[in-house]
Amino acid sequence: MRQRAFLVLILGATLIGLVPIGVRLCEMHPLAVGFWRFALALPILWWWSRSLPKRGTSVPRRALLVLTGLLFACDIGCYFMAIRATTVANATLLSNCAPIFVALGVAATMGGVPSRLALLATAVALGGIALLVGERFETGHVLGDALGLVSAVFYGGYQLAVAALRRNQPAVRVMLWVAGVGGLALGVVCVIAGIPLMPTRGLDWAILAVLALVTQIGGQGAITWAMAHLAPVFSSVVLLVQPVVAAVLAWLLFADGWMGPWQIVGALLVLGGIVLARRAQADAG
């Protein structure tokens, strides 16, 4: 099962690598893009969840489901705004510091410390991300960089919350609550801030549909399912496939930077970190 979960997690991470490309192509406000990513996915998730057994959910469990949705909404909001407020490279690097916060969260909330091999895997993979986008990292974007780093904190919290929920909650139920709560939160913020919610271009509708179907339902759905079978720190490291995919696509589509020798070394280090993390997962049993 872990082998299958690992492959599904890789697939999910690859699919969400499309997110920065969609945000850059869409002309809408980043928070409105985040709202529609959730809103368009919600009807499909609701229909899918109808097949689940009808059973009550305890108040603490519902509170955790709501918290998970809020954490992901905050992550999406901060990350999407960071993509517009700073360079894609800066936003990608800073928002993918989540494994650091996941490791700290595991130590703080679960009473355990990740193994040395798991910590080494995290360091190697993050070093690879730094090399991958290092030449494109620019200073002078304080607000955007801060948003990118804050999004990593929220994403780390989201991953820990999903890992806790998946011990006894189906993936579809978690995804439904995340989309519902996240969409409501971002929608309210857009209304209060006076941010237009309706797309004005057919291309924007197409981009929003891809973000909802491919990245939210497909990508996050795969990740949510896989996290029930894998350790949080391991999952967080594997998800660093996402910025590798995003960097390669940005280079191919927008000529955003150059995939030279150091970038290739960085991508290989990320893969090496994933291999080490997988070894740590196996050693942990």
Feature map (PLM): residue ranges:
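Helix-helix packing/entry segments at the starts of transmembrane helices
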Residues: A13, A91-C97, A161-L184, Q216-L252
